[in-house]
Amino acid sequence: MDKDGSNIKNHFGILICGHGSRNKLAIEEFKDLTLSIKDRYKGIDVEYGFLEFAQPSLVDALDKFKKKGITKVLAVPAMLFAAGHVKNDIPSVLNSYSKKNNIEIVYGRELGINNLMVSAACERVKDVFTKNIEIKPSESVLVVVGRGSSDPDANSNVCKITRMIVEGLGMAWGETVYSGVTFPLVEPGLNHIVKLGYKNVIIFPYFLFSGVLVTRIKRQRDTVALKNPNLAFYDAKYLSSHPHVVDTFEERINEILYKKNNADMNCSLCKYRSNLFGFESEVGLTQVSHHDHVEGLGISCDLCVSECNGSCELEIQALGTQLDSGGKSGHHHNHHHHHSNYPNAMHPLGPVNLKAKEEDKS
């Protein structure tokens, strides 16, 4: 079997499965990433689709393959770690389409943690020191911001990324915070970190793309920075289309294409498969999607031209509309779909209690 698609009896296609965003820049960045992947698989049909809030949907992308007579699709989730979207929502769409249309869909792994992803992360943080030669890693604390989910395995993987960067660059200290769902959130985490005594704070959003969450992180950083004028805060760029990220996508595709290694996810710490302490009630739960009613919605936010400026959240707050929290996705667009109960939803530094404190102040 050749990488250019020759010597293949049944023509196949590659589907890059994205989450989706209402932010124009995030979608453009995703498209650029897909083009980089296409460049590595010339002669093979490569399409992309989104789970929600952007077009084309995953079904739209699969329809393109069907119209071309493609009978096998290699689907790879464009997500850093395996939480609900990777384990439940995307597979639900793919399985349903496969059964209805008699198309074989082989699902690959999330990007996960490998040397390539660690190197990409280290280089993003190293760029801060290259551009600011007056500061040193040994005098700086690193704050890695993960997305946050109700899946403890996905959350813990962000901590591993933090440690690998800290040791790789020789940082003075490292902390992990999250943008939503779990704890500690960005602002309370930073309020703790500024007490450690380091004069430089490097904030690295461990995200693939731009969007409202990255903007929210910057706004919360500004809030803490105003209260700590003696400290210097620096932003590391999120991953985007870093060459090593593209390399990892190629690795995941090739795991399926050439049946190299094991393309299955690591289930040893999956809360649905293993009796994880504190998550015993979720072992064996039926893994179902709750995105069917938002899939394919593609209304872009028109409050900002390109990069999210946070106007959407400010507008929602002005209207008194509650943002998602406590086991929900935390996006600026309300999902209104059910998530399983998260044991730590009521943590003092989690979204529910912090939201309540803010409302008490107002």
Q: Residue locations for each model-derived region?
A:
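Active-site-proximal alpha-helix that buttresses catalytic centers in soluble enzyme cores
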Residues: 1-362
